[in-house]
Amino acid sequence: TVLNEGETRLNIASIQRTDRNVQQFGSGELKGFALQVGTQFDKTKVGFETQMKIAEMNLHNIPGFRDFEMNFKVASLNRQKVQDFFDLLEKNSAACVAKEERNQDILNSFLSIVNDGFVFESQNNQIKVGEGYAKANLTGRVMPGHQSSLESLVKMAPSLLEYQANLEYDKQIMKNYLQQGGKTLSDQELEQMLNSMQQTLQAKREGDILKVGIEYKYGEKKFLN
């Protein structure tokens, strides 16, 4: 399979599941589902991007939400090595060699890609519950390494990973989420919860909005606010 630049989109206006027992997990409706997957590359690098949106979702015993958006992008991958990896996957079922040998070739190809390092980001993510909202952004990178096995990659991952995350959410989303889950808090109880979260996450508070910043580098996490 030759890597091609372009996009694939899937749009579904409505999905509804109704069980005889309306309290069955999964019963409900999803509206305005959109999924987009894209590939971008130049002469030496390739990147992949996924975007998902849900206009509204209402399921039994799960707090309903709307205007859900989630995005994730991986970039600066070695184009030739990614192509080789997909070629191995395609040949895997037709290969006349031992399964263990095929799996090892695929693993080695995967490690070769990761060892070159890459960058990633997840921007403009959001969700709304009632009039409340939450937003999140993430940027980071995996630094180059020299891992020869999956075990060593897992072991070294904390020192190879760097990221910065920013989360913003308001008082109303917590109140609405708890109410839809069947739990009602007084304004005083909700305020105590927010104060506790502010201290635990070292969050910055602006009125009814909490902002949390996290940086992870050299295997250590620190709060930025």
Predicted segment positions?
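Glycine-rich, small/hydroxylated-residue low-complexity segments
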Residues: 1-225
